[in-house]
Amino acid sequence: MSRKALFLLFAALYAAMIFVGCSPTPGPGLARGEQIFDTCFPCHGKDGRGNMSLGAPAIAGLPRWYVERQLHNYKTSMRGAHPQDTEGARMRPMAKSLYRAGDLESVAEYVATLPAGPAFNNMMAMGDTAAGRIAFQSICITCHQEDGTGNEALGAPPLTHQHDWYMMSQLYKFKSGMRGAHPDDAMGAQMAAMSNTLADTTAMHDVIAFIRTLQQ
């Protein structure tokens, strides 16, 4: 993305944040969450489906508990603080702007109402689904479930509506220490350990190829 495009994006985000700050502020809940979401859709889209050019994942279809946890992680710098995590560097100030009591929970509640849509995958030619099935069943299934729908008790989000390019980027971040390395991020540390059992890029492509079959 060009420097001019980035400038325009952040100008739009700043304007949205001012609008939210100057508008009448409802109490915690869906109405407040929808108001706050005005600062989110320039990257994630009004439908929450994400934007590959900005590295913004699909958030529509994510459960409230997972959105809350990730916003908390960004807000407390457990996530997104690594100097090479450019996408995280954009998310941290967004999360830190949720300073009013109930704001974080309200926007998570609103995001959880957005209906999930099909994943926008751009790695269809990559990966061996048979090899990926073996890896998924030995590494991922315990937390993310056989059908990839996730498990709140284990802190595992659903994978069935997430874009393959985003899953690939997060596996790389977990493996490289950009994500899951903070001493207070127990869930992230668990994912980092699981990601490190995937030997190389080929193995990551394989497991993502299998996850794509769960999205059909």
Question: What label would you give each PLM region?
Answer:
Residues 23-26, 49, 58-60, 106-128, ...:
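His/Cys-centered metal/cofactor-coordination and adjacent catalytic loops
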Residues 30, 34-76:
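The feature marks the first
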